[in-house]
């Protein structure tokens, strides 16, 4: 049997490849393919630090919005789109999921929520959290299981995304440097990947502040809390440079003295 004559196939221009897209505003994403690695703690801290530096930040939450809002001192009674002042700048929290978040980042922009200088994204612990192109991707890990998931996530990360590896929990710096090299090699990322050399400690003082909606940047700068803040400052500095190329993060206002620091006692606070 002779088949019927086929019609000609006409070309249709394709959308831009997702691995070359760039967000409408400078965007930092904090993501890990594992829960419990202080992901929301880091994203909220970075957003607040940028605001303290004088810019207006959109904090886009694609994970549990209530958790992120609570960490910024926003109650359930506050509006869905809530804004908090931090120094001369502000953080506006918006909860969007899936294609709605992508539409805001890459197509429509955040204009309906206000004017912003930068976007910080907090994602759920899923692989697609590392698949956003053209962003600064901060990826916390806290051990072998988390690192194995992280490697699988980074293998799917677009080439135009910059990656920052962060170690949560105290381990020797040399051990973390070795592990960071293993992660980079196993994820096939020879370029566009850096790491924070000092592991970030989990401190009760930081955890309690976030659970109460208090900014970590108002805590006494001592002991392990100071170590955490130094790491947060470095990450915020990268996010700032991503948003304001050629400039450096303005220094934080000096802390108010809070008395003597007792080594071994305050360190565990």
What label would you give each PLM region?
Residues 1-34, 55:
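Extreme N-terminal, non-catalytic leader segments
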Residues 168-219, 228:
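Beta-strand-loop-alpha "switch" segments that mediate conformational coupling across diverse proteins
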